[in-house]
Amino acid sequence: MTDFPSNSIVTLEPLIEAVQEGVLAAGWQLSGLQKTTSHQFEGRWDGESTRSAYLFFHLDAGPQDVSIDVYLDETSRGLMGNMALVVDLLELQDLGRMQTSLGLLGELSEASLPEGHRTPVSLRLRLREAGDDPGAAEAQVRFKLQLPRATIGAGHVAIVELAQATVQAFERLLEAEALRAIMPPVG
């Protein structure tokens, strides 16, 4: 007898299938799927092994600088994962003050993503070459939703529904005028 409900997801593959089903049902296309297995950790993770999956989705008719990236992980501690809307933004010099931009992105996330879930936002900056002008740094935002263990434990249908709701929230984010104003022009 196990401690898991009969419909609980306890391994990586059913979690991949449920998330993928939810995102595809929302109209996005699978761009890629990568699975990895890691062994022989040292230190804190000594004796552990993990299996991870990365799924990438795009819209056929959508902007090319937008994707949904999904990270799923199976460890001896259980399953976990997150879904992220990844959006390229204007160059750093055109974004304005970082604190203001990050605050705006946080407000957009809070207003759009499903309530009751952890929804971190990250703003990444990258210089193409170390000596480049910092003002020309590429900027990218990731609006994330962490998949709750309780939802994973609730099974396939719960994950599909959360994945669909998250994609719909991501699409609302993409329609927000405040986000569009700091995205590169289309074309």
Spell out what each predicted region is:
Residues 2-8, 12, 144-187:
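Long, solvent-exposed, polar/charged low-complexity segments
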Residues 7-32, 163-167:
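Amphipathic alpha-helical segments
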Residues 19, 56-59, 81-89, 163-166, ...:
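Extended low-polarity, hydrophobic cluster-rich segments
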Residues 21, 25-36, 108-122:
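Short glycine-aromatic motifs
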Residues 22-26, 92, 108-111, 172-176, ...:
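Surface-exposed polar/charged interaction patches
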Residues 24-80:
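Amphipathic, interaction-prone secondary-structure segments
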Residues 58-157:
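Intrinsically disordered, low-complexity regulatory segments enriched in Ser/Thr/Pro
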